[in-house]
Each structure stands twice: as structure tokens, then as C-alpha cells.
Amino acid sequence: MRKTTLFLAVTFATSNAQGRALRSSSPATYGTTDGSDYILKTGYLIGNGKLGVIPFGPPDTEKLNLNVDSLWSGGPFEVENYTGGNPSSPIYDALPGIRERIFENGTGGMEELLGSGNHYGSSRVLGNITIALDGVEAYSKYKRTLDLSDGVHRTSFTIANRTTAALKSSIFCSYPDQVCVYHLESASDARLPKVTISIENLLVNQSLLQTSCESEAKRAVLRHSGVTQAGPPEGMKYAAVAEVVNPRSSVTTCLGEGALQISSRKKQLTIIIGAATNYDQKAGNAKSGWSFKNAKDPASIVDGIASAAGWKGYQRLLDRHVKDYKKLMGDFSLELPDTTDSASKDTSELIEKYSYASATGNPYLENLLLDYARHLLVSSSRPNSLPANLQGRWTESLTPSWSADYHANINLQMNYWLADQTGLGETQHALWNYMADTWVPRGTETARLLYNASGWVVHNEINIFGFTAMKEDAGWANYPAAAAWMMQHVWDNFDYTHDTAWLVSQGYALLKGIASFWLSSLQEDKFFNDGSLVVNPCNSPETGPTTFGCTHYQQLIHQVFETVLAAQEYIHESDTKFVDSVASALERLDTGLHLSSWGGLKEWKLPDSYGYDNMSTHRHLSHLAGWYPGYSISSFAHGYRNKTIQDAVKETLTARGMGNAADANAGWAKVWRAACWARLNDSSMAYDELRYAIDENFVGNGLSMYWGASPPFQIDANFGFAGAVLSMLVVDLPTPRSDPGQRTVVLGPAIPSAWGGGRAKGLRLRGGAKVDFGWDKRGVVNWVNIVKRGKGTSRVKLVNKEGDILAEM
């Protein structure tokens, strides 16, 4: 590292990074899953955490595909005495035999601990709200945008043969008021056409639905309610409303029970949309009989919410939404060059023309996708909602792929990679509450019944009803490391904010529970007899044998133990026996850092002669979790500065390929690789993978698909894309306890020259600091402005990738 100190803090005016928008000159379509017109390939997504909406359809029959976070089949709403997959009595007596066979042979089976996914359930769509306009079958000058500066979806068009009849609609979902709002407006003095509203879901048994219409001077509202099954037991209840704001200024008429017509309206029409279920996350415990049920009728709940919102009027609702949205979105921005006037073009055109073969990519589009990822997180995860699931908050189906659940062996983690560094830490409150309310209670049972362990545990696939046990196949279901990986997010949230009150009240209890589980589950290695502590049994996520000492698990437990000990500076744990046990176990823990005969990192502790640690192109990079997004290797083992480890990571990534193997061609596999290359300071390979992900997996509406450009839609790659971009902008690792001196943060470790002349604003650093910085045409950071200094006790040095010291604090 060069010691020359230069490049002082500089501040200059920047354009508004949040002025970017998704654009289209044609309406979104519903289509079919195997067609290019599929709704999740054409629609732009909006939401407020609890509610998710996809507007689609032509202007004469614009539809709002409506989702509510907790609308699920399965669980206690499908079967009496739902157990979350747990057995009715302990089965841990099988563990000693399982472990003995594995230590004796290197691998083995564990069928005795497997369960089933019966009554697991699935996230499901609520329905479509149709807003039909009379006499608008033919139209021109159609435009559709999702403005990422305010989160408002807008359309505009002109009715054919009526040159003065230009109409525009605006749709947004408000977190402050817990509703979505549809607003129709005439650009002239002409009256609005006759409007008819209806709510339907043709996918469900119609006998389970009920609609009603109310049309009075004081209130005009369409109500829709249903239940997921007739029972017994009775299924989950849900309800939706569409309410006209200020009905006195129009003539409203009920067309039977299923439609509401509005006529003689002047220039504007506003419709409030709300939805709710009788799911209660706080009732997922023994005290509540594991019911997850709210005794209140969701119809009355949503009716009250919509009525209260309606009294505020459109402008106040919009102002409150925009203020809340900008508070989260406006505090971070990335500014990359737009050398091809991409800002004025349809997003689908930009993506269609994007080519991996072009080494310069399209920086504007790459910037747009990062902004869209932040929008999607704000729209699908807020403090009073469930976390973002496999599809965020959006599905058009009753049975989306993998139930649109929570897969916790990369997908859920990737959803939140971008949160802490870009000022969206608030979105993670949904995650902490979900884990505390639904994972911990049942997971404590699972730990006891399956492992005879203290603490709590979950496995790979988790629903909203506390399914914490294993499903049927050890290859993917045997994954008790899920919560250990999630503890990285818990610690990072504290490390970036230094919110000690939160750590004391919620975060540390989660960490302690997982550390306790592993303290009572780790085994002394009887295969190598080296005295180390290892996991037995374990499966590396979705690949390889059931064995012991899987690299992935060992790295994650290493992180858990290290962060529990680091937390003592702020917690002052009274249970000194627990702290001593963690410290003692950490001294003996195999930390999962072993090199293979061909130079890569080993995925299994087994000798190479067993044939598992070959040059696999598998989609997962599980044995690199401690490199990125974690830091067991990159920080605690000093790997970021160690050439031997760097070379091993490089060999592993090279062998693993581009993320397009026969087992999957998923976007998330590619962006994970991009992030790992970035942590190697390799801008060329990081940018290659990022471009390849866009070219292969991203479709015309900016979403990423799983099988190349074919469904299913998985939102993790959208979020992971942003995480990869951030890893190209900064390497900011936690300080190892063994090295408490000055911490070095590298700004711009892997910025490609295609992004030359760009800048970032509002990037968060560990310890609570916030910085703005920019770089030259080569991608080398040449100025930094410290906007906010951190609360942490360690000193921080900011350098660029050439080793120049930019600032110290």
C-alpha cells in the first residue's frame, strides 16, 4: 500500500440520482407464464410492505393485481394441531448412531430425522381490481412509467377521435396510510368517462368468495372477502375494498353486488384500495395455541383503514406517501454515466439490446437496476409487514414456484444484502420480527425434538406459520445452518448503525439462541481425530453427501461465535458461563478453511480422495459464504490481504463457472459470483458476471428470471444485483477481535472503467459513518466527503484500490 496521502474531501452539486424511471410505450399484459407477455415480465411492481400491486392491461380495462403479505394457504388454517413440521415426540435418539456412522465412513444417511412438507402451504394472490373506462377502446400516445424518485406508477394516453381527451392515471401504495391509491385525471376540462370498478379472482372456488357494493351519498365502496378453505378447520379469512373518495362529486351506482359504477365525474377520481387477512404473526407460539389467528374480522379492519385514508383526500395521501418514500430512497444514490441517452428509452428496449459481449455494458441501465432493487425492497419489506419472500410481495398465482416462501440457504439472505449500506436498515425490522415471532418459538421445539439441543434452529424452507423442521430430502432439507447465516444480518445491522438499544432488546437474544444451539450440537471430530469441533451431520446446500465438517457450516458458526463475543462490549452479558463456553468452543472450532489438491477452497472436510471436492459448476457458492457476503475468511482469517487465500478463492470461482450450468441458469448465482470477484478487487470479472446476469436473466420490466429469461421470477437476483454493485463500490469488513487496531475501508475496489467519472452519495460504513465519493475515468476513487462520522470506537482509514489514503477518521 502506498503511503502518500492525497485527495481531500470534495463536495460538488450532483444531479438527482432518483430521477430514473422504468418506461414503456405499451401496457403491461397478463399473458401466460411461458410467453413474453407474462405479467411478471411486463408489469412494474409497487407496494407498501403489506400490500403489493402490479398494474396491467390497456387503458379501457386497467387492472391492479393485488397481493397481501400474509395471504397463504396451509398451516393451522388448513389442518388442526399444525406442528410446523415437528414430530409429536423426540427423535434425537437416532443422532448418536447417525454421527457414529458418518465419522466411521465419512458419509452416511440421516433418514430418521427427515420430515415432510405436509400442509406447508403457499403464498397466493388475492385477486384483480378492474377499473373499466367507457368509450376508451381506442387510444394513442400511451406512456407508462414507474418513477423511482417517488414510487408512483403513472400512465397517460389520449382517447382516439377526442384530441382534447387526454387522461392520466397514477397508482401508489402508501406505507403511512396502509392503502394503495388509484387516481384518474383528465388533462382538460372534459368530464371523465364513465368508470366501473370490480374485484374478482377467477382462480379460486367462487363459493368461497363474497362481494358486496355500497353506494350512498357519504360512501361508495366495493367489498370483496373470502376464505382459503371451507374447513374444518376454517381457512384464512381475507378481505379487500375499493372505495371512492368524495362520492358526492359524482353519481355512483351499484351494478349488482359485484361492480360499482361512477359517472358524471368532473376532472378527477380517486379510489382507495385496502386488503387484510386474519393472520397474526404474534400468535405463533404455545401461549396462543400456535393459531396465528387474529380474532378480529379482516373485513372490518380493512374497511376502517380505507375509510380513514379516504378522508385525507388524494393530495394529502400522495404527499404523505412521497415524504415517506423519499426518506428511505433519497438518502443514497449512485451516479453512472448515460452516454447513449438511455434515460429517454423504453426499459424493455434497453434490456433487449443489452449484450454481454459489449465490454462497456450500459451504465445507465445498471444504475437503473440498482435503483429498482432499492424500490422493490422498500415496497416489499416494512416494519409492520412480513419480510420480502422469494417473489418479494408479488404473485399472480395460487401456487407460485417454491410457494414463494422463505428459502434460507442464500435467497432470503440475498434479499437484504443491499439494506444496511444504502440506508434501508428500516426494511429489516420485518425480518427481525418475523424471526423472533415465528422462527424462535417453533425452532426451540425443533432444536429439542430433533437434536436434544438448547437454543433454536430452522432449516432451508420456512413458511409464515413457523415451519422450522426438515422436509423430505437431506440433500436440500438438512440445513440447520440457516439461522446461523441469518445472524450475519443481525450483527451487520448493529455494526452499521451501532443501535445498542436494538441489540439489547432484540438482536442479541437472536444471536445468543443460535450460539446456544451450536454449543450443544457441535461434535469433536472423530474422523481426523484432530480435536476440532465440527457439525455432524451436515449437507452443503443442495449438493454433495451427508457428512461432517461442511465448510459452509463451519464458517457461519465461526461468525456467530465471533460476533457474540464482540457484542459483549455493548451487552455486558450476566451469563458468564455462556460467554466462556463460546470462547472455549471458538478456540477448538474448525473454521472451514481448507485447500483442495487443485488449489481451490474445499467444500467438505473429507479428504479429496473421496471425490467430492472436484471442479464443480454447481450454482451455489456455499463454501465461499465466509468470503462474501460473510467475513469468516475475508476478515477473521485475514483472507482479503492474504495472497494464498485470494488465489484459492479465485481458483474456486474459476472452477465454479459463470453460474449457467445444467443444474440452473439463475440470476442469483451470477450476481453472487460478481460480488465474490469484486471482493478480490477484480473489476473485470465482477463486471463480466454482472453484465452476464443482465443479458441472461433480466427481462423487459427489469425483473430477473430463474431459467435464463424464463420463469419463475425470483426477486433475490434483483436484490443481489444491488449487493454486487455495492461490493464493487466498497470493501468494508468488520474488525477481527484479534486485530482491534485501525480498520481499513477500500473505496472502489472493483469499479470498471465503463463507470468512469461516476460517484456515490450516502454510502453507509460500519460504525455508523456515511460518505460521498467519486472516481476518475479509470474507476479509481479520487475524492471522498465524510458526511457523518461513525459511533464505533475503532479508527478508520479510507483508501482507494491503488492504496492511496483518501481520509482517516
UniProtKB/Swiss-Prot annotation:
Source species, domain of life: Eukaryota
Any one biological process term the GO annotation gives: xyloglucan metabolic process
Residues of the signal peptide: 1-19
Chief localisation class: secreted
Protein family according to the UniProt entry: Belongs to the glycosyl hydrolase 95 family.
Organism: Emericella nidulans (strain FGSC A4 / ATCC 38163 / CBS 112.46 / NRRL 194 / M139)
Name of the protein this chain belongs to: Alpha-fucosidase A
PANTHER family: ALPHA-FUCOSIDASE A, ALPHA-L-FUCOSIDASE 2
Biological role: Alpha-fucosidase involved in degradation of fucosylated xyloglucans. Hydrolyzes alpha-1,2-linked fucose. Active on cotton xyloglucan oligomers but not active on paranitrophenyl-fucoside.
EC number(s) on file: 3.2.1.51
GO molecular function, one term: alpha-L-fucosidase activity
Glycan-carrying positions: 81, 105, 128, 161, 205, 452, 614, 642, 681
GO cellular component annotations of the record: extracellular region
Gene: afcA
Keywords assigned by UniProt, alphabetized: Carbohydrate metabolism, Glycoprotein, Glycosidase, Hydrolase, Polysaccharide degradation, Secreted, Signal
Alphabetical list of Pfam families matching this protein: Glyco_hyd_65N_2 (PF14498), Glyco_hydro_95_C (PF21307), Glyco_hydro_95_cat (PF22124)
Catalysed reaction equations from the record: an alpha-L-fucoside + H2O = L-fucose + an alcohol
Subcellular location(s) per record: Secreted
